[in-house]
């Protein structure tokens, strides 16, 4: 074929043969790959001895041949291309005809596949009904009874066995992934060599043993002290301030309740008491058994107090350290019977305003001292946290965490069995809703079983400390299931303001299982929301990690009397709450609706506008001290500006969401990311997480909080010598900048920030 082409070209140009025509399509050095290079090699036998005139004629003839040769080659190339293209089209047309014929003859499989109806997206009404149906089919009390059979102190073999049981249950539920997380922590237990003891020393120096208590207070200082005994009511700061007797160098006895053991001990220590005894009075805790033992812990914080601010993983090389929240004085729980024996050696009746037992006395009789000996020992133990996840269908890297404490000192029916049983049943129900009910959560749901909750949310806090960077802008809500049923009369809640709107909608949807009325009964319910306490596992999520958290429970007007005792049994719980199954089901419906709304809706159900009210309340409180602030040469103008910028940022975010194209996942995700930043950026960036782990300026603890700022300012009027002006100046400046930082984060990108600061 090449010979024929060469012959044709030769004839075209007057029969003069050319050796070859070569095209080079290689990429040139300058990057132009569209250049076509054509080279003509002439016969080497040409006579090179021609004169100048013949040479000129030959070059002209060669240029003409080059031009005509180029045209000929292009024509041949186009003819070949057209022939090939027409042949390809013919084959394609034949194949299309075959396909058309197959379709016309009725290819039933293809038609059937095209006509499969697509499953429609489930909406809120559908999901609410689906959840209710799943919960109706569950018997909760059998699981609670099973879990309450034995004591399961953190790190014990029984605690570990229960962890493996929960892990296997998660696997049986076919969750997307199940895993465990282990930590090596230090907890305090009663010493085996010597018992803890409370003794009365009379005027003659003789001792009379009051009790070797069955319970104890973890993280108490192990020592022996002796001194006068003074009653300090509940041991609140105000109770100590109202005492007519100085507690300096004395032991104090306080009633259980109202605040945590750790706060009672910290207050006593701040007033220079040398030791603390804690008991349950019959007025507040109407327990028949006067010798009932009580358990608690005295760490003013959460997590392992010997690895503050960092996780307790095995073989970590952190230097020895301990939390500043550990007490430097001994503390011990005693029975009501022991307290009454101590009162027999005391004088002066307790004030009627205390509303306590008639036997209550205020101070030791003349010459009578009390000796307290605590011999607790530290024990390093392995604890297991168990996790299971249902992965989201659109944003699996965004998730909520639903958790419950697993361990308990004693049977722990109300303390941890109800929560653990509820955790298991919710995991089962939601797994079934996804696999069979058509529920497709956009975001993931993590179910977590914590250990060492009795020692200050140790398991939960260590997990947060270990994975804080991984959880940032991924975990956006924590739902706590601990102690959700302690009665039937009231429904109470503690939560981040970001969740208030979600809680209100849920209370309007869920009905009380006894009277059938909605849980929402008071339009002013937000003012009655209780702050998360140190002994609540939701607290470190909010105050340490900046993750919005919620804890809720059904209860009576009085405290449940058996928590943290050996009488926290299934039988006692059923006796107090006869319709336990219905109450747990109602709690499951509350938690279930939280889960659905947080994982299903396009926009995160976090109402950032609620913090406008919190900031405004803080500004109003400071305004009461304008004269004092002005006297120091300071102004609140910058705080007003920061508050205004936050308000404008929230308004702009709301507008951005309303104007956003809801089908554009990238845009919606960007808006949700801005919402997720709100809680986190209320963590003060100006304090060390190790020195002040609870950095949240609203809900944390330390001098960086807004509460501490106001308390310091109040001292200027009450006790000017105790007021620290330098500290106040720093507090005001850093609080202002923290609020401004939240406003900036909420605004979005740096070029979107337009503030007046």
UniProtKB/Swiss-Prot annotation:
A Pfam family matched in the record: Peptidase_M28
Residues carrying Phosphoserine: 10, 19, 24
Chain residues carrying a lipid of type S-palmitoyl cysteine: 67
Ranges for region Mediates interaction with SH3BP4: 1-67
Main location as per UniProt: membrane
UniProt entry keywords in alphabetical sequence: Cell membrane, Disulfide bond, Endocytosis, Glycoprotein, Lipoprotein, Membrane, Palmitate, Phosphoprotein, Receptor, Signal-anchor, Transmembrane, Transmembrane helix
Topological type in the membrane: Single-pass type II membrane protein
InterPro entries noted in UniProt: PA_dom_sf (IPR046450), PA_domain (IPR003137), Peptidase_M28 (IPR007484), Peptidase_M28B (IPR039373), TFR-like_dimer_dom (IPR007365), TFR-like_dimer_dom_sf (IPR036757), TfR1/2_PA (IPR037324)
Keyword presence, Repressor: no
Motif Cell attachment site, residue range(s) on this chain: 643-645
CDD domains tied to this protein: M28_TfR (cd09848), PA_TfR (cd02128)
Motif segment (Endocytosis signal): 20-23
Modified residues (Phosphotyrosine): 20
Entry annotated with the keyword Cell membrane: yes
Function, in words: Cellular uptake of iron occurs via receptor-mediated endocytosis of ligand-occupied transferrin receptor into specialized endosomes. Endosomal acidification leads to iron release. The apotransferrin-receptor complex is then recycled to the cell surface with a return to neutral pH and the concomitant loss of affinity of apotransferrin for its receptor. Transferrin receptor is necessary for development of erythrocytes and the nervous system. Positively regulates T and B cell proliferation through iron uptake.
Family according to the record: Belongs to the peptidase M28 family. M28B subfamily.
Quaternary assembly: Homodimer; disulfide-linked. Binds one transferrin molecule per subunit. Interacts with SH3BP4. Interacts with STEAP3; facilitates TFRC endocytosis in erythroid precursor cells.
Protein name in the entry: Transferrin receptor protein 1
């Amino acid at each position: 074929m090449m010979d024929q082409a060469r012959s044709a070209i030769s004839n075209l140009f007057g029969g003069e043969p050319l050796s070859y025509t070569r095209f080079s399509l290689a990429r040139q050095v300058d990057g132009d790959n569209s250049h076509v290079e054509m080279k003509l090699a002439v016969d080497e036998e040409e006579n090179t001895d021609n004169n100048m005139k013949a040479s000129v004629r030959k070059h002209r003839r060669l240029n003409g041949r080059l031009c005509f040769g180029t045209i000929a080659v292009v024509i041949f190339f186009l003819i070949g291309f057209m022939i090939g293209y027409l042949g390809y089209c013919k084959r394609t047309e034949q194949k299309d005809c075959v396909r058309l014929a197959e379709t016309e003859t009725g290819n039933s499989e293809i038609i059937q596949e095209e006509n499969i109806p697509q499953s429609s997206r489930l909406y809120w009404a559908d999901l609410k009904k689906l959840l209710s149906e799943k919960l109706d089919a569950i018997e909760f009390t059998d699981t609670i009874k099973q879990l309450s059979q034995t004591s399961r102190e953190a790190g014990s073999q029984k605690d570990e066995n229960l962890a493996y049981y929960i892990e296997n249950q998660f696997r049986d539920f076919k969750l997307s992934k199940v895993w465990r997380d282990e930590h090596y922590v230090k907890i305090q237990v009663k010493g085996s060599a010597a018992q803890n003891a409370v003794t009365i020393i009379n005027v003659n120096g003789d001792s009379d043993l009051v009790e070797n208590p069955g319970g104890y207070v973890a993280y108490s200082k192990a020592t022996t002290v002796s001194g006068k005994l003074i009653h300090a009511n509940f041991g609140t700061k105000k109770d100590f301030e109202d005492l007519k007797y100085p507690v300096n160098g004395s032991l104090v006895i306080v009633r259980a309740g109202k605040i945590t053991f750790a706060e009672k001990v910290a207050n006593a220590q701040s007033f220079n008491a040398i030791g603390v005894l804690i008991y349950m009075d019959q007025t507040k805790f109407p327990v028949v058994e006067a010798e009932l033992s009580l358990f608690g812990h005295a760490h003013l914080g959460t997590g392992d107090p010997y690895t503050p601010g960092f996780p307790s993983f095995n073989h970590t090389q952190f230097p020895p350290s301990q939390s500043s929240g550990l007490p430097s004085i001994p503390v011990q729980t005693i029975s009501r019977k022991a307290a009454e024996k101590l009162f027999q050696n005391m004088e002066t009746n307790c004030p009627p305003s205390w509303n306590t037992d008639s036997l209550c006395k205020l101070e030791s009789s003349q010459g009578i001292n009390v000796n307290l000996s605590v011999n607790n020992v530290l024990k390093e133990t392995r604890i297991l946290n168990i996790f299971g996840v249902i992965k989201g269908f659109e944003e699996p890297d965004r998730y909520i965490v639903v958790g419950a404490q697993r361990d308990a000192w004693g049977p722990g029916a109300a303390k941890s069995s109800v929560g653990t049983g509820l955790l298991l049943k919710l995991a089962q129900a939601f797994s079934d809703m996804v696999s069979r009910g058509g529920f497709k959560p956009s975001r993931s749901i993590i179910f977590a079983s914590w250990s060492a909750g009795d020692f200050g949310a140790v398991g939960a806090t260590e997990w947060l400390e270990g994975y804080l960077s991984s959880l940032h802008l991924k975990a956006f809500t924590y739902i706590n299931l601990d102690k959700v049923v302690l009665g039937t009369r009231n429904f109470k809640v503690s939560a981040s303001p970001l969740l208030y709107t979600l809680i209100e909608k849920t209370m309007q949807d869920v009905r009380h299982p006894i009277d059938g009325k909605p849980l929402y009964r008071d339009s002013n319910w937000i003012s009655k929301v209780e702050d998360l306490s140190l002994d609540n596992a939701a607290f470190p999520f909010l105050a340490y990690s900046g993750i919005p958290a919620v804890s809720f429970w059904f209860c009576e007007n009085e405290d449940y009397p058996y928590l943290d005792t050996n009488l926290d049994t299934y039988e006692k719980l059923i006796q107090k709450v006869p319709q336990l199954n219905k109450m747990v089901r109602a709690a499951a419906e509350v938690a279930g609706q939280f889960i659905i709304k947080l994982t299903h809706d396009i926009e995160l159900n976090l109402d950032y506008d609620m913090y406008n009210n919190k900031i405004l309340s803080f500004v109003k409180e400071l305004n009461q001290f304008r004269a004092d602030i002005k006297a120091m040469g300071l102004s609140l103008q910058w705080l007003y500006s920061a508050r205004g910028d936050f308000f404008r940022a929230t308004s702009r975010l709301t507008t951005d969401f309303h104007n956003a194209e809801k089908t554009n996942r990238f845009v919606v995700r960007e808006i949700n990311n801005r919402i997720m930043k709100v809680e986190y950026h209320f963590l003060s960036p100006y304090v060390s997480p190790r020195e002040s782990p609870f950095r949240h300026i609203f809900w944390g603890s330390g001098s960086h909080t807004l509460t501490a700022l106001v308390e310091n300012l109040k001292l200027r009027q009450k006790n000017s010598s105790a007021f620290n002006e330098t500290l106040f100046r720093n507090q005001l400046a850093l609080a202002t900048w923290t609020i401004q930082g939240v406003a900036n984060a909420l605004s979005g990108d740096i070029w979107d920030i337009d503030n007046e600061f």
